[in-house]
């Protein structure tokens, strides 16, 4: 049975995983306790970061957000990839954002579909140059070329055309993106059934909302239908808060920083439980008079994850282009 308001199919398909999971489960008592604490603090999600995100012009900004989230995946590795920008050192997602901003400020035409369609591995290596190499460099180069080609062929080089076609619907834009751009089709198989996550497509929509302050190309009437963005950091935070529980064998593998294969039952269970851990927390907050959408709860948890104490269980390590 489909969950009400789940036109994306993410809640419905991940619910089946949570109900059958063998290695990951949700602690409902912990959900209630954390909801009480968050409601008492009147926590609010972070605002769009304009220091590290590039912004210049309406259509160029829309194309930039597409590029940003086309390569918004897999930052872990040893040694950890870092870059220096404006006198500070960044790693992870913020290194990605700063790298793209640095390149655009240096005149690299990253918002031009024809340039993207022909971008080389060396070009991409230069854009992300820093300490160490960004993981999955070849995949990022391939995806940027694919993104440029689709953008040129399907949308005349303007992602704003795709946004306009969605008619202020976040759900419609996720559908357009996942159908047009193959790298955004974040779907797994669990016990013979398809499971949808659409992490980067959904975060793309929420990033448009943030970058445009909820107006113009960032205006959507159904943002509340987005789910959490199942990545590395949010499940780590949920586990730290006690909302996610892991079977001992999986807990030990994570503690050893052992790689969890993409598409494995354990990886799919972690991601599905992340979707529902956030959804249950959202509902618990709403019942306590603190209404947030799932994507806002996700933003809040991701931001909390930037300040986890030493000794926190490491996030799961999976080599994938989807997150």
Curated annotation (Swiss-Prot):
<dbReference type="InterPro" id="IPR019438">
    <property type="entry name" value="Q_salvage"/>
</dbReference>
<feature type="binding site">
    <location>
        <position position="199"/>
    </location>
    <ligand>
        <name>queuosine 5'-phosphate</name>
    </ligand>
</feature>
<dbReference type="GO" id="GO:0101030">
    <property type="term" value="P:tRNA-guanine transglycosylation"/>
</dbReference>
<feature type="binding site">
    <location>
        <position position="93"/>
    </location>
    <ligand>
        <name>queuosine 5'-phosphate</name>
    </ligand>
</feature>
<comment type="subunit">
    <text>Monomer.</text>
</comment>
<feature type="binding site">
    <location>
        <position position="306"/>
    </location>
    <ligand>
        <name>queuosine 5'-phosphate</name>
    </ligand>
</feature>
<comment type="similarity">
    <text>Belongs to the QNG1 protein family.</text>
</comment>
<dbReference type="Pfam" id="PF10343">
    <property type="entry name" value="Q_salvage"/>
</dbReference>
<comment type="function">
    <text>Catalyzes the hydrolysis of queuosine 5'-phosphate, releasing the nucleobase queuine (q). Is likely required for salvage of queuine from exogenous queuosine (Q) that is imported and then converted to queuosine 5'-phosphate intracellularly. In vitro, can also catalyze the release of the q base directly from Q as substrate; however, Q may not be the biologically relevant substrate. Shows a very low activity on queuosine 3',5'-diphosphate, and cannot release q from queuosine 3'-phosphate and from the 5'-nucleotides AMP, UMP, CMP or GMP, indicating specificity for the queuine base.</text>
</comment>
<keyword id="KW-0378">Hydrolase</keyword>
<feature type="binding site">
    <location>
        <position position="298"/>
    </location>
    <ligand>
        <name>queuosine 5'-phosphate</name>
    </ligand>
</feature>
<feature type="binding site">
    <location>
        <position position="231"/>
    </location>
    <ligand>
        <name>queuosine 5'-phosphate</name>
    </ligand>
</feature>
<feature type="binding site">
    <location>
        <position position="72"/>
    </location>
    <ligand>
        <name>queuosine 5'-phosphate</name>
    </ligand>
</feature>
<dbReference type="GO" id="GO:0016787">
    <property type="term" value="F:hydrolase activity"/>
</dbReference>
<feature type="binding site">
    <location>
        <position position="302"/>
    </location>
    <ligand>
        <name>queuosine 5'-phosphate</name>
    </ligand>
</feature>
<feature type="binding site">
    <location>
        <position position="229"/>
    </location>
    <ligand>
        <name>queuosine 5'-phosphate</name>
    </ligand>
</feature>
<feature type="active site" description="Nucleophile or transition state stabilizer">
    <location>
        <position position="231"/>
    </location>
</feature>
<protein>
    <recommendedName>
        <fullName>Queuosine 5'-phosphate N-glycosylase/hydrolase</fullName>
        <ecNumber>3.2.2.-</ecNumber>
    </recommendedName>
</protein>
């Amino acid at each position: 049975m489909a969950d009400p308001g789940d036109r994306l199919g993410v809640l419905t398909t991940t619910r089946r995983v949570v109900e059958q999971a063998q290695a990951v489960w949700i602690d409902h008592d912990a959900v209630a306790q954390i909801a009480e604490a968050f409601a008492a603090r009147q926590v609010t999600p972070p605002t769009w970061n304009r220091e590290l995100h590039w912004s210049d012009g309406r259509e160029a900004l829309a194309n930039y957000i597409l590029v940003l989230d086309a390569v918004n995946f897999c930052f872990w590795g040893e040694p950890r990839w870092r870059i220096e920008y404006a006198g500070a050192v960044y790693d992870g997602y913020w290194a990605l954002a700063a790298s793209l901003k640095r390149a655009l400020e240096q005149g690299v035409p990253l918002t031009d579909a024809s340039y993207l369609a022909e971008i080389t591995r060396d070009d991409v290596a230069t854009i992300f140059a820093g300490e160490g190499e960004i993981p999955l460099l070849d995949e990022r180069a391939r995806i940027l070329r694919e993104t440029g080609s689709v953008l040129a062929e399907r949308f005349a080089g303007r992602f704003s055309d795709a946004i306009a076609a969605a008619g202020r619907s976040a759900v419609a834009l996720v559908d357009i993106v996942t159908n047009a751009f193959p790298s955004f089709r974040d779907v797994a198989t669990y016990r013979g059934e398809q499971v949808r996550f659409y992490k980067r497509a959904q975060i793309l929509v929420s990033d448009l909302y943030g970058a445009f302050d909820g107006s113009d190309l960032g205006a959507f009437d159904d943002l509340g239908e987005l789910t959490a963005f199942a990545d590395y950091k949010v499940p780590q935070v949920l586990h730290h808060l006690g909302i996610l529980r892991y079977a001992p064998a999986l807990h030990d593998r994570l503690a050893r920083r052992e790689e969890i294969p993409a598409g494995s039952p354990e990886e799919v269970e972690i991601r599905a439980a992340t979707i529902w851990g956030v959804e249950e927390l959202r509902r618990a907050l709403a019942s306590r008079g603190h209404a947030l959408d799932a994507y806002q709860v996700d933003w809040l948890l991701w931001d909390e994850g930037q300040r986890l104490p030493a000794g926190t269980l490491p996030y799961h390590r999976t080599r994938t282009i989807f997150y």
